[in-house]
Amino acid sequence: MAAPAGGGGSAVSVLAPNGRRHTVKVTPSTVLLQVLEDTCRRQDFNPCEYDLKFQRSVLDLSLQWRFANLPNNAKLEMVPASRSREGPENMVRIALQLDDGSRLQDSFCSGQTLWELLSHFPQIRECLQHPGGATPVCVYTRDEVTGEAALRGTTLQSLGLTGGSATIRFVMKCYDPVGKTPGSLGSSASAGQAAASAPLPLESGELSRGDLSRPEDADTSGPCCEHTQEKQSTRAPAAAPFVPFSGGGQRLGGPPGPTRPLTSSSAKLPKSLSSPGGPSKPKKSKSGQDPQQEQEQERERDPQQEQERERPVDREPVDREPVVCHPDLEERLQAWPAELPDEFFELTVDDVRRRLAQLKSERKRLEEAPLVTKAFREAQIKEKLERYPKVALRVLFPDRYVLQGFFRPSETVGDLRDFVRSHLGNPELSFYLFITPPKTVLDDHTQTLFQANLFPAALVHLGAEEPAGVYLEPGLLEHAISPSAADVLVARYMSRAAGSPSPLPAPDPAPKSEPAAEEGALVPPEPIPGTAQPVKRSLGKVPKWLKLPASKR
C-alpha cells in the first residue's frame, strides 16, 4: 500500500484532471493502482475511469513501483481510460505452489483476499485449521504476507493482480520464540547434524539437492508436509561416498572414525584423483600374479614402511608452539611523521586510472574463468592441504596480547577453544571467538579450520562477556616477544609450504594480520601480471570537464 506522508523514501506527483497535484509516498512494493486510488480518493474521482500516464506512455497499473522503471519524484498525469474497468470484478487464474513443488490452480476474483484463496483448497484448509505452531505465509514476487491478519487484509487487487495468471508460493513457517527467527518444521532437530556434516566451501559439486533450495522450501504444511518430511528422512542417510584426500583419515568436519589402510583406498580412488595429469596405465605383473598378492608380499617385506604409509599425515600430532607477542614490543625502524601532508590524501588522475584498470582486470578474470570439474576441484583441495600441512593461528585478546599456535587443517574450532582455554589465567572465563570483517562468531565447535576459512593462516579475535584485566597466564606474559620474532617462528615452521611448484594453481593464502597496516597504506598495490596496465599521463593534459576537488595544475 502507499506509504504515509512524511519520512524518507520515494515519492510520485500525480496531476489530477482538475489541475491539482497530489504527492504520494511509495515503497518498492507499492502497486501503481494504489497510487491512482489514493489520488482519486482525495480528489473525489472514480479510479475505474482513469489511467496513469508518464510522458507519452500509459502505465500498467498492475506493476509494482520497483518494476515500473520510473524515477523518483516522477510526474504522472491522470488521463481518461481507453476502456472502463467498472462492472464485475476481473477474474485472475492463480497457481498456488506448495513446498513440495505441487501446484493447486483455480480462478478467483481480484477482490478476494489471500485468506479466502487459501481456504478454497481443502488441502490448505486443513493446515490453516491445525497450524501446529506454524504461521501461514504467502510469497508473491518479492512481497511476503505473514500471518492470518495480514492474509485477511490483503486482496489480489492490492498485489496488482487484476487479470491474467500468477503464481503464489505458500509455506508454513515456525518462528523460534527466543530469537524470533523463522525456520522450517523439523529443522531444529536436525540443526546439529547439518552443522556437523556441512560440506566444504569449495566442494560445490557435492552439494545435495536440498542445500541448493531456499530456506522456505524446507517448511512444512499439513498432509503434504509429512510426505516431504518422510522424503527428507529417507534422503538424509544416502550421502555421497567420501574419498579421503591423503589415503586415510576422516572427512573434514565429519565424525571421527577408524582410519583406512592406504592399499584399499588407493585402489578405490578414481583415475582423475590418483593422477591429476591424466589416468595412469596399470603396471603389468611379470610373474602373472594377482595384484593383491603382490601387495601382500610387499607388505610382508617392509611392514614398518607400510605402517608409516598408512598413518594419515593430517592426523599426526603437531606441536602447538604457544607464543605470546605484543605490538608495543616491536622496535620501530623509523619514526613516523606526526601528521601526513595534505597531498597524500589528494586523488589524482593516475590513482583513478590505476584503480579502474584493477577493477576491469578483476572482472575480466572472473567472467572468463573456465568451468572446472568436480575432480579438478577435489584435486585443488588436495593440493592445498599438501602444500600447507599446518595452520598458523593468532588469537588477539582485548588487551592487545596475541597468542600464536599451530594446528592441522582437519582440527576443529573446538580444538582451538581448548588451546585458548588452556593458556588463560582464569580457565573458567566465558569467552567466544570471532573473525572480522565481517564479524562472524565461530559458534560451531565441530567445524574444521579448513571449513571455517582459517586456512592456512588467520587472525582470530577473542571476546569476553565479562572484561578482565589480564587474560593470559602470567608465565606466558613474562616471555612475550615482538611480532617480528613471531613471524620468524611462523616462517620456520611453515617452510614446507614453499616446496616444488604444482601443476595446479596455487591457492591464495589468507592474509596474516600483522601490525603493519600503516606500511601497506603507503605502498601502492602491485599490478596483476597479464593485465592491461594503466597509461600514465601528465596532469597537464587533464580534460577541462574533469574537475578534481583539490587538484593543482
UniProtKB/Swiss-Prot annotation:
Compositionally biased region (Low complexity): 182-202, 260-280
Function as written in the Swiss-Prot or TrEMBL entry: Tethering protein that sequesters GLUT4-containing vesicles in the cytoplasm in the absence of insulin. Modulates the amount of GLUT4 that is available at the cell surface. Enhances VCP methylation catalyzed by VCPKMT.
Organism from which the protein derives: Homo sapiens (Human)
Full protein name: Tether containing UBX domain for GLUT4
Residues annotated with Phosphoserine modification: S184, S275, S500, S502
Lineage: Eukaryota, Metazoa, Chordata, Craniata, Vertebrata
Region (Interaction with GLUT4): 317-380
Region (Disordered): 182-324, 499-536
GO biological process: glucose homeostasis; intracellular protein transport; positive regulation of protein modification process; regulation of D-glucose import
Membrane topology term: Peripheral membrane protein
Quaternary structure annotation from Swiss-Prot or TrEMBL: Interacts with GLUT4. Interacts with VCPKMT. Interacts with VCP.
